[in-house]
Swiss-Prot record:
Role description: Zinc metalloproteinase which cleaves human immunoglobulin A1 (IgA1) in the hinge region, rendering it less efficient in coating the surface of colonizing or invading pneumococci. Strongly contributes to virulence in mice. May be responsible for pneumococcal infection and is potentially involved in distinct stages of pneumococcal disease.
NCBIfam families associated with the record: LPXTG_anchor (TIGR01167), YSIRK_signal (TIGR01168), ZmpA (NF046017)
Protein name listed in UniProt: Immunoglobulin A1 protease
Binding locations of Zn(2+): H1645, H1649, E1669
Organism: Streptococcus pneumoniae serotype 4 (strain ATCC BAA-334 / TIGR4)
Region (3 X 17 AA approximate tandem repeats): 419-469
Sequence repeat start-end pairs: 419-435, 436-452, 453-469
Amino acid sequence: MEKYFGEKQERFSFRKLSVGLVSATISSLFFMSVLASSSVDAQETAGVHYKYVADSELSSEEKKQLVYDIPTYVENDDETYYLVYKLNSQNQLAELPNTGSKNERQALVAGASLAAMGILIFAVSKKKVKNKTVLHLVLVAGIGNGVLVSVHALENHLLLNYNTDYELTSGEKLPLPKEISGYTYIGYIKEGKTTSESEVSNQKSSVATPTKQQKVDYNVTPNFVDHPSTVQAIQEQTPVSSTKPTEVQVVEKPFSTELINPRKEEKQSSDSQEQLAEHKNLETKKEEKISPKEKTGVNTLNPQDEVLSGQLNKPELLYREETMETKIDFQEEIQENPDLAEGTVRVKQEGKLGKKVEIVRIFSVNKEEVSREIVSTSTTAPSPRIVEKGTKKTQVIKEQPETGVEHKDVQSGAIVEPAIQPELPEAVVSDKGEPEVQPTLPEAVVTDKGETEVQPESPDTVVSDKGEPEQVAPLPEYKGNIEQVKPETPVEKTKEQGPEKTEEVPVKPTEETPVNPNEGTTEGTSIQEAENPVQPAEESTTNSEKVSPDTSSKNTGEVSSNPSDSTTSVGESNKPEHNDSKNENSEKTVEEVPVNPNEGTVEGTSNQETEKPVQPAEETQTNSGKIANENTGEVSNKPSDSKPPVEESNQPEKNGTATKPENSGNTTSENGQTEPEPSNGNSTEDVSTESNTSNSNGNEEIKQENELDPDKKVEEPEKTLELRNVSDLELYSLSNGTYKQHISLEQVPSNPNSYFVKVKSSSFKDVYLPVASISEERKNDKILYKITAKVEKLQQEIESRYKDNFTFYLAKKGTEETTNFTSFSNLVKAINQNPSGTYHLAASLNANEVELGPDERSYIKDTFTGRLIGEKDGKNYAIYNLKKPLFENLSGATVEKLSLKNVAISGKDDIGSLANEAQNNTKIKQVHVDGVLAGERGIGGLLAKAEQSSITESSFKGRIINTYETTAAYNIGGMVGHLTGDKALLTKSKATVAISSNTNTSDQTVGGLAGLVDRDAQIQDSYAEGDINNVKHFGRVAGVAGNLWDRTSGDVRHAGSLTNVLSDVNVTNGNAITGYHYNEMKVKDTFSSKANRVYNVTLVKDEVVSKESFEERGTMLDASQIASKKAEINPLILPTVEPLSTSGKKDSDFSKVAYYQAKRNLTYKNIEKLLPFYNKATIVKYGNLVNENSLLYQKELLSAVMMKDNQVITDIVSNKQTANKLLLHYKDDLSEKLDLKYQNDFAKLAEYSLGNTGLLYTPNQFLYDQTSIIKQVLPDLQKVDYHSEAIRKTLGISPNVKQTELYLEDQFAKTKQQLEDSLKKLLSADAGLASANPVTEGYLVDKIKRNKEALLLGLTYLERWYNFSYGQVNVKDLVLYHLDFFGKGNASPLDTLIELGKSGFNNLLAKNNVDTYGISLASQHGTTDLFSTLEHYRKVFLPNTSNNDWFKSETKAYIVEEKSTIEEVKTKQGLAGTKYSIGVYDRITSATWKYRNMVLPLLTLPERSVFVISTMSSLGFGAYDRYRSSDHKAGKALNDFVEENARETAKRQRDHYDYWYRILDDNAREKLYRNILLYDAYKFGDDNTVGKATEVADFDNPNPAMQHFFGPVGNKVGHNQHGAYATGDAVYYMGYRMLDKDGAITYTHEMTHDSDQDIYLGGYGRRSGLGPEFFAKGLLQAPDHPDDATITINSILKHSKSDSTESRRLQVLDPTTRFNNADDLKQYVHNMFDVVYMLEYLEGNSILKLDTNQKQQLLRKVTNEYHPDPDGNKVYATNVVRNLTVEEVERLRSFNDLIDNNILSSREYASGKYERNGYFTIKLFAPIYAALSNDIGTPGDLMGRRIAYELLAAKGFKDGMVPYISNQYEEEAKQKGKTINLYGKTRGLVTDDLVLEKVFNNQYHTWSEFKKAMYQERQDQFDRLNKVTFNDTTQPWQTFAKKTTSSVDELQKLMDVAVRKDAEHNYYHWNNYNPDIDSEVHKLKRAIFKAYLDQTNDFRSSIFENKK
């Protein structure tokens, strides 16, 4: 055959394309057959000529060259293809599509060798202009001469008008052959070349690639796509391809020859959609004619189009449709399969006849036919008998035939929608409206010509004519982790994807599967779901049928509606009907080749899902045996993607929608040859494309392996609504404006429309269904009422079959029950009438049946004296949902074998679940309770009080809350609050508790089993487990019993007793067994767990300290022993109780669903959360698309959150179209974001496509108009006033209780301002209203109005305390509305907010925020506590950020975290989440931190008003305004000042504890890692404050620091006039300020109080009799100033040589460099004492030279006094300094006499009593010669401090000072009989002589000996004194005179002079005496000391030679 020269038809016809309509007005242009060869751009375009030939025109020789496939790629510069068609019937021939008007048609008839009236042709040329691919598309209408072209070698006369020329780029995909009415395409002949079979097969796979023909509905003629974004039925035949760059390139659509002008498509999509909307549900059967009125298929042109077409006033154009069917023979082919190993030969498929069903749309104007066009063509392509020959390990797309495009033309049932969705971001549209393929799109590669070059990996991208990627309805393909779809890999486009006779199936717009532009159908595919079920396989079989074995069944029926996708949509079989080849082979192929998720639906597949249920597996299977699970049948509705999506393969790895036949997995290379392609999880794209192509060719190969037998119908699983995992059903009715729940019915109501059903689920939110009918039925001799609820598309699975609507039964309520009860209301009524009767439960009862008033205390008011038994006929029953105690009182009653489930009881007085009180030998046995009790007084899990009554073999499990602040006595217990009386017994029972309490006084008790056990009551053989968090430390709290003491009698004999009990309870502020210890307690065999955390804040030695409590621990067992001990004590097993009649727990079982894969069970569960309301078949369908590499396959999905970028979306209705991201939150805190794109609505659910996954997502809410609800409730809510009585009543407070400490007033106002938006979110997040109904809406209105105060309080509370972010994601809405975030999908945000608001004043107090989360929110969120929840959020949104870093970035507080300079410490401090971390968040969330409630206030600070300083041992908090004044005004000045000083303060605190770390041993060092609270005073200045602010602010103060932090934290600091004070676990600055320098010294003082006993003193504690102040001031505290003349250690301040005070400095310059270890400290003090002892010796000698009177003036005597302490001990010395008598003076003859007579200087030690625990310092230059000791106890404060330092100099800190000032030798003292009574206990008494003995090992017998030895040691070195130069104090200071000496004698002379002067002046006794000025001795000693201090570099060396 010769190539016809330049066959380029250039006839043009301007017309507006509407859906399925060829404009009647076409300007007829007749052109002669003058076709000059088109010019080729510099981009090497090639001329491709399509000549249309009837098979009758072929010679037998030519028929042998026929290739039964579709041309694929441009190979040469100039190519001619003869496209061969077979005539279906003469009738069909008679009318070819007419594009002209009636008059024009008459004119056109002339000269047509074929009676064709106006043939519509697309001429397409592609060119690249300014980097944009532009397709010039012209509709050429013409006939006759203009088209008659003589063919030299092969004549084509009959179809000459269809000839078309294209200018394409080499390697580009070829356009698809056109659909010609009355003809069936069977193959092609390429001029001058014979195509090998292998090529043919390859081409099949790529068939879809040619221009995508518009596929008209393949399934149902009458159905029209009405989705605005999807293009509607496109006139298939004409569109050759044009506007889509991709269409020519990657037309993976089955045969869509479509390609319509983008602009026209747009018009079609808009106009036609409106016109066709009415006909959406109409279904035309074959040959059925519909009148224009019946099918409101009215198409109109835009005025401008009408002008173009020559017609301005266009009459109404109507149409009807008819169906025609033609059979197609099959042939035999041999294919090379790259998927098969070389040498392997197999029969790929047996031949099978195909058939072609065409739906012709006949257009008429004024009842006269003006034209007709093929709306859709459903081709079951013949399956050629294909023999495969393996060439390598690649899959030959020959199998694609199976998936091959059935038909390039529109398949029947597919609605071709010309308009491409413009919003698709994937494609750029050029100025011509043609899509510009973006090179970045992975799906399509654009050649230099701008044409998409098919890439093996991007089969998915199909660009619509508009240049926008067509959306594929969520093609089954899954690209969660999909590899990029490769266009060439088109898995054979599943031929079967569209049902062959899809015409019957109305295709539904893309409701079901929103296409993700990037997904497989990427560009151009639009997936639409058919609303009707896909027809049987035979009809639906399309290329996709064969796709994967399982795929066809589900996918079939879906057709590509996109013009460009015209390639057969999945679901159609393009194979000729005649193919007799057996389908068995195709089945195999399909099975063998998993579909690549990315393929299949590649371009143009439009997945249309039928809404009917999938047929049973056996029915759905095609010849291939297995039907592609879900994809088959899905067809792309997009113009460019008409190709059928490949059916999903069931193979797990191919999550793709389209299943590829064996070869389908291969990608098609540019030349059309298949290349092996790894199974990408989703091969939908390729499959659909290629399979479509093959099918479209009609080649036998085209059949997909899964293709069903032509005679069988494979139905896509019908997508319906299904309510799964139903746990309970509640029936409500509206009567007289009141809603009532019905547990049963008495009769059939006359007005069922006033009823609705609340369907509760164990996994999903409540759904409200309107009741359609209620009828009475008799079953098993019982009268039941059948309740039927109806909602669009809702079905219910009953006995493995689905039935429309939702039904359930309620029992008939017995008019009266006397003994056996099945109704709670009847039970309550009966007992109230006769409280002494015997009652049995005959069913589990629901307490919701009875509503109580707000003031009612119990359900049964009178005292019950009868019997209540919860067991009947061997079944155990329960009462559910008690809101109040069941009984008020029990007296002599019996209650047994009863369970109380889900109690939620609250009350202001004493409460218990079963009863408030039981007395008079009431017996409670085998009663089990679970739930929550909250109150303000006594609480018991079963009883608040049990007097002379017993509880046996019973249990409680749940939460008990009473954090109410009151001084009233109360008792709280896990089982019973107060157990009292000698007959009272609790035995063989257990409690699992979480108790939150706030005991304030000793008569408030809390116990894991009982609070108070007194008057001989007993607890035996029982145990408690769980947690007790008691905020305050003054109550009696313990794991078993709070108190056993009988307060009534005060007699230990009548106390309560414990026998064989165990505590496995973590207790804060309490003990393990009992909360109060006394002698002779009646306890026996008590046990506790070592693993429990039992911390007690208590009063120890005059101080409040927090430490682990080992008191009342009983026998401590290892954690491993606890379980066995519990079993031994009490092997209690709880009974199994019957659920409520309306309850049930049935998880979704997917195993019975067709195509279920066991290994995907988790995946189905995950998809279930993405499609919460869809039926199981649909879930399985999409579950099979999930890639095995995807998190959706591997991890449990907890929740899905819609977002717009980084903003959480809750209001779905308002943001339906703007949502663009879906956050998937998986278990283990994993998450991922997928692109989200709205597709359409289905049954009031918004459907979205998910990224490139091919998956669907629907929010967990139905779309309904919330406006009416909001309008009704908003006014009422707006009227609520924060200070109203209604609010107070809701809070439960009296008028005189302030609401201040809620700190909600400002937020309350803000919340009201934003109420409308909040209500939209709330209604969206809450129960699903499946149908707009005044009854269900009224129920919500009523609930909101009735609880408006509580709702506002709850909403305000959460908006106030949870308004913070993680990065860019604010979590407020997650906390408020997305309660399912952590996997608990059935919580109601509305109910949660209301219950939170009703939880009471105490629960809503800001300071209780941590407990409030645990009490009111944790269970609703499915979490455990606040901090684990915050961490989970952080791990999801900021996985690479630590908790602390996130916290610091979010809070507006100024945080300084100062790590140690010691490397090992610094390293530990960087360990996040450990006790070593100095991260503020880590520390304040620690379990041992008292103020964990700081987290939320700090996270929500609105401004910078608070600073935080964190160092090794402390955590400080202060307000900026504490430093605000006229000098530091608000703003930058204040901020800079505070922040600079905060940094400096942090460094000082760091240095102080670095010092201590260096000198302590390892054990003590470990204890330095702690968390002492530092608080600056609540004193706030303003810009006018002078100096320091002094006024104390209270919690009402408006200061921002108080309002937003200090107040909400609730630490009511007691302010006083001190500089600061410590409590043992905290330091409070009062007069001093934390950031000042004196605040640093205060820090060392107060921290000594918090550190001495357990850390500084080695854990030995303070020595008995020494008060806390002894250890701070004058001993371990740093000196106040550098020039302090005291014996102290500077451990905190760094001084500088350049300081102004340097000349006077007497303390260590820099402690960080001076003290590197304990030896350095000892060396410093020892060397310092070298100077001290020497100077004291010199002074003493000088004084001895004076007369008696002078000596008396200069010296005093220190003595001891003894005063009894509170325990009567008279052993603690009090130092008294007094003047000497003459006699005493006269005894002072030698230096040692000064020591022996306890002499000290009068210069700085005034006469008087130095009280114990005083603030005294030891003077550096005022000698204490005395060695006064206390041999019967503890030294006085003066002598104690001095001797302590002397021991430090002599023996060091650990070996000298610590033994002296601690109780280190207490045990030795006790052994020696030295004891005292302390706090009722006998303790060892350490005496001075014992210390002397132990420290010096009997070296000295008296302290005088020790002291003399110390002086002597220095005297012995006087001759080696180092030379020193010092200020000459005898000269005026202005002279700066110096004196140098190395002679002690010279120093002695100087001292003599100085002493004499002082004696002469006699200043020592003056009141205003100042030694620095008035004492010559002081000045001399100071000068010498300072000189030696400097000379020795802070005493790093001695003042004596050769001594260090």
